[in-house]
Regions:
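Conserved thiamine diphosphate
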Residues: 28-32, 84-116, 156-172
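Cofactor-binding active-site loop characterized by glycine-rich and histidine/acidic residues
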Residues: 1-60, 78-84, 89-96
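A glycine-rich helix N-cap at a beta->alpha junction
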Residues: 58-68
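Glycine/aspartate-rich loop-and-adjacent alpha/beta segment that forms the canonical ThDP
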Residues: 120-172
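Short beta-alpha connecting loops at secondary-structure transitions
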Residues: 72-77, 97-102, 144-154
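Structural motif
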Residues: 35-40, 65-67, 129-131
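Glycine-rich, charged/polar anion/phosphate-binding loops
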Residues: 50-53, 112-119
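Acidic, glycine-rich active-site loops and adjacent beta-strand->loop/helix elements
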Residues: 4, 40-46, 68-74, 105-108, ...
Length: 172
């Protein structure tokens, strides 16, 4: 629904990144203040397309926020089998993109980090990279054999919605 700012979605790993950069380039070229935001998983951060997009986003100072949902697994494989970096945000650092790694399950941290990144992009300061550390509440897909993953992984205490509800309850 482009009329509400949603351009597209794709099932291709990292395929939404160049689409977000295209939207950001279009906004910048028209002199508009729109900001593109792309959400992707840690598996996408292991693709060549990811690095090409980081390079161009930085080179062209595009108004884009790249949000990596890092749950530590690329489909079935632990992240340690795919990369040597401790933080996936380190990749963006290499391209001169400001980064922040946060607890992606804590909405009180996500919202202000996103606001800073969006303001940067909207004010012409270029891209930002947010690495949101999280966990899987469900399998990678409906038939995922890892649905039997340990209870610590599925702990409802980590659920961001329930966690924020507790935060609101405690604040009243």
């Amino acid at each position: 629904a482009p009329e509400v700012g949603f351009v597209t979605a794709t099932g291709i790993v990292a395929g939404n990144l160049p689409l977000a950069l295209g939207a950001a380039l279009s906004s910048k070229g028209r002199g508009e203040s729109d900001v593109a935001v792309a959400f992707f998983g840690d598996g996408a951060a292991q693709t060549g397309l990811f690095h090409e997009c980081l390079n161009l986003a930085s080179l062209w100072q595009l108004p884009v926020v790249l949000v990596c949902e890092n749950n530590g697994f690329a489909e079935f494989s632990p992240l340690s089998a795919h990369t040597v970096v401790e933080r996936l945000a380190d990749h963006a650092d290499t391209y001169g993109i400001p980064t922040e790694t946060i607890d992606g399950n804590d909405l009180t941290l996500v919202r202000p980090a996103a606001a800073v990144a969006i303001d940067r992009a909207r004010n012409g300061a270029g891209p930002s990279f947010l690495e949101c550390l999280t966990h899987r509440m469900r399998g990678h897909y409906e038939g995922d054999p890892t649905l039997k993953r340990g209870t610590a992984e599925r702990d409802e205490a980590k659920d961001p919605i329930q966690r924020f509800a507790r935060f609101l309850d405690d604040a009243t």
